[in-house]
């Protein structure tokens, strides 16, 4: 606090002692009073004094006010008074009408109090927590106070909010507040928060800020809205400008499409309010932020395409050609359209097709050029039209060809009813207005930029100077105007046009040198010692002469490279020439023009350099300097290298064209494949639908069939009793035949099983007898597992056969029972003479038994069917066992061969071991004879190892 008193010592005589004492007493009440009402009244009194006695209240009461915010959060009224008091202390808004000499002091005072407040970061965190309160009297003063802190000391407050947990998210909730004043002040708060802080900008953008802000703009009426729309647009600019991540997020979120509604300006609009002009101006600037030339090329291109696809470019062109548009809006619209079409072929083609609503219709380019060469139009508008024309021709060879074609004799309209772009450019080039000369020269230079074909085509242009005189070429007319000594702006424009025209075009250089007056004029301009105003012209003349040397193909004997360099050395001097050449890049307006493509000048006098021309100077200044100092031999070598490079470039171009054609073919084939895939998918879906329909029809058919069978069964139930004696014996006989077949098949299966058992036993015996103990030791566990599996399969087959035999026996018994029942039924048929009642009773009994027999017959049929299926399965298992036995036989043969080989190898090893032992014994005896001690333990150890190996082998044999 003493620091503030020292800094603001000039105000020490400020209030009377009674006021200072009052403030001190109020602070004491806030600090020491136990009653909430007393503290509340004291804070309210401090609030009323804080505007007039800002310094004293700030020095004495700030700590107490912060303490109130910490301890009295339950009382919204005292919190509101405390926040308002802090706002009055920190904010400079109330000092706007104060005299200028005290304004700076008040600003310093606000920043110093802000520094004291944020010295403890917990104070900002406390303020963020208060913003979560929904109470209007707490939330709104908190928003105002935090906004004031950000305005006073933005970066440190931003850093505190950034590291605070959910700090930015809490502030984003303000945009969803239903109370407009809080929402609107929340927008202002976010403006201050996002200024020059990329990290916070990203967080705010990913907190759905774009969606909320665009909704607010739509609710407020787009461009017809009030100052809230302006604030939202400024916040959107903060989020998007120089922030590639947010720009990509804005494009990917399809928010560009929502911008189209902003520019739907109807002709029925009675007038343009100042707020509407401001809003539309900011909207156009926001579009330019997305397509700025300083953005990454990929991001700019994608935004340009999105703007064309959603109709935003079309809407901007509608405003461009509309009537009654304010001049500043029209100028900004031209600049916006310029950057939307810059370098985008699709957008440039669309812009070329736009016509002005005139009779007859004229292309928009022609109408704009008419404004550019008209000296009565505003300077800013003419600059905007030039920028639009430059952007239309940027990387647009098609557009360049169309503009140059309007200058050629074959395309000029003989009737003179329509004015072409070429005629307007020529008219501006040779006008008496120096600004028109400069603009037309720069525009024509952009029609030639990087396009050697159009440079050659422009050499064909002939101009009729006066009646009776022969036509003069455009190139010659430009040099004639240069030699006449016109204004500096005109000469600079023509020299820039000639430098652009002659660079990278040896044919144009030859045409230029063919006029014998051009070289002496250039050398004379360079050699003279003129004032500072003419130094720029001298530098441009030096550049033009250097281009004539560097791109010279030596087709003219009098003006070869070597002769021109000798001429420079004689007339000018190499050092003097290089010094004059450096005048261009040292000019103060050169660096300004090289920064941005847009020709943005405060007045016509500053309109000297073009952005693209500065690039050309950077490219050629160094190579021209080297070319001046090169010898003829080095020039020859360089020409050979150039020819080789040209040949290489031609080959590369040829292959590029081939690759391009192949790419087109691939694209066509891919499209065909995609169409065929679509057709295939459609056919597959159709087939699936048809299959489902067929299945439905089948199900319906089966259902109808079952229903029909039930009906037939009910109809034939009355006649079944009469056919018992005829049908039942047939069924029984058929069952007997099936049982006999099952018996015979069972016998056959048992015989086959017996044969398989004998085969397996033979294999086992042969395997046991044929394999030695070593073979058994080397036999893989996999073979043993296969044998075990075969045994299990055989046992399973046997058990299945036993179960089948039991089933057959059961069926035989059931068959005999059926026969007995049939005989009893035959005996129980009624005899003549019995009473009708007895006959009816017996008939009923017979019908019941008959239905039971029929049911049992069906069950027998099902069982027989199951037995037949089991028989088939057993047959398959037998076949698989046969194949397994064959495989085992082959494996046994292989094992037998391996055992034989291993026996031979073991015999050989035994022989080798015996020889080795003999050698070892002889060596040991020799060592003993020589007197060396020999340990006998090794032999015993070896012998023990051998014994262990033999024991292990015996165990393996036992296994």
From Swiss-Prot:
Region described as Disordered: spans on this chain: 925-959
Keywords: Acetylation, Coiled coil, Cytoplasm, ER-Golgi transport, Golgi apparatus, Membrane, Phosphoprotein, Protein transport, Repeat, Transport
Xref: SUPFAM superfamilies: ARM repeat
Domain comment quoted from the record: Composed of a globular head, an elongated tail (coiled-coil) and a highly acidic C-terminal domain.
Membrane association type: Peripheral membrane protein
Modified residues (N6-acetyllysine): 202
Function: General vesicular transport factor required for intercisternal transport in the Golgi stack; it is required for transcytotic fusion and/or subsequent binding of the vesicles to the target membrane. May well act as a vesicular anchor by interacting with the target membrane and holding the vesicular and target membranes in proximity.
One GO CC term on file: endoplasmic reticulum
Transmembrane portions of the chain: none
Coiled coil: 638-930
Membrane listed as a keyword: yes
Subcellular location field: Cytoplasm, Cytosol; Golgi apparatus membrane
Residues the record lists as Phosphoserine modifications: 50, 940
Composition bias type Acidic residues, residue spans: 935-959
Cited InterPro entries: ARM-like, ARM-type_fold, Armadillo, P115_Arm_rpt, Uso1_p115_C, Vesicle_P115, Vesicle_Uso1_P115_head
ARM repeats: from-to residues: 20-60, 61-121, 123-163, 166-207, 208-253, 255-310, 311-354, 363-408, 420-459, 473-513, 518-571, 573-630
Quaternary context: Homodimer. Dimerizes by parallel association of the tails, resulting in an elongated structure with two globular head domains side by side, and a long rod-like tail structure. Interacts with MIF. Interacts with GM130/GOLGA2; interaction is disrupted upon phosphorylation of GM130/GOLGA2 by CDK1 at the onset of mitosis.
Annotated spans, Globular head: 1-637
Modification comment: Phosphorylated in a cell cycle-specific manner; phosphorylated in interphase but not in mitotic cells. Dephosphorylated protein associates with the Golgi membrane; phosphorylation promostes dissociation.
Name of encoding gene: Uso1
Protein name as it appears in the record: General vesicular transport factor p115
Family the UniProt entry places it in: Belongs to the VDP/USO1/EDE1 family.
GO term, biological process aspect, one: small GTPase-mediated signal transduction
Signal peptide: none
Lineage: Eukaryota, Metazoa, Chordata, Craniata, Vertebrata
Pfam families the record matches: Arm_vescicular, Uso1_p115_C, Uso1_p115_head
